[in-house]
Structure formats: C-alpha cells, structure tokens
Amino acid sequence: YGYHRGLHSFPTRRSSDLFLDMDFHVLKAIPENLDVLEFESKVLADRGLIPQIPPRYRSTYFSHTFGGGYTAGYYSYIWAEVLDSDAYQAFVETGDIFNKEVAVKFRKEVLARAGQDEAMKLYVNFRGKEPGIDALLKNRGLN
C-alpha cells in the first residue's frame, strides 16, 4: 500500500506540487523576508486548491524539485500521464487493448525513432493527433 495509499487524492496532490514548483521558479528573486508557508498557501488558494488536501511535499522539504534535476519540471509527471492515457486510448479504440497493429505502430513511430525528430511529431505520427486531456480525465473517472 505505502506509495499508493490515498491515491484518490493523488492528482490533486501532484497538481499542488507542480504549481508550487512553477511559482517558485518564476520568481525573479526570492525576497529575503519571504514567508514560505504563506507563499505556499497563497499559490494553492489562487489555484482553488483546498487546505484539507495538502501538497504531497510541503515547500519546506520539497527537495525533489529544488535538489536538482527537476528545475520547474515537476509537471512532467502529469504530462507523462497525459501521453500514457492518450496512447492507451489508441488501443481501446480498436476494441482490443492488446492490438498488435497499434503496438507495432507505436514501436515504429515513437520508440524506434526516439531522438530522431521532435517528440510531438513522432507522437502525432503514431496517434494521428496531438494528445489531449480527455483520455486522462476518462481514466480518472472525471469525464
């Protein structure tokens, strides 16, 4: 259970983390007198997130993003879920989630060509369209 406990609130928690990440990183300079918890509360309130579902990581120990490697990129987790959900939908649309033709097309157009062209172009070659949030919302039961 550990990691997945409370999964029902996971999208909200992940959203709050990415908003905090982005809002901290767009500051031109961090004021010396910045009250970190007040800043955090304002960021979340401005996005309509309620205090009853706190961020997964509080700003005072959010080393995952501030420790290097994720600089203003925590949103990539949600983007990966968008791509995953939309690609999975290609299989669902055939009526067979193990559809060999779709799997081969994904391998040929995305995996085998990784790094050879822009990622979005490769994805569109596979899917025939850019990914949207509809499949993600459907997977989460929010459609």
Feature-to-residue mapping (PLM):
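Amphipathic alpha-helical substructures
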Residues: 31-45, 58-64, 106-113
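Flexible loop/turn segments at secondary-structure boundaries
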Residues: 27-29, 85, 118, 132-133
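C-terminal amphipathic alpha-helical interaction region
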Residues: 96-143
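Non-catalytic terminal accessory segments
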Residues: 20, 27, 32, 36-42, ...
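Short, small-residue-biased leader/transition segments that mark boundaries at the very start
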Residues: 1-4, 8-15
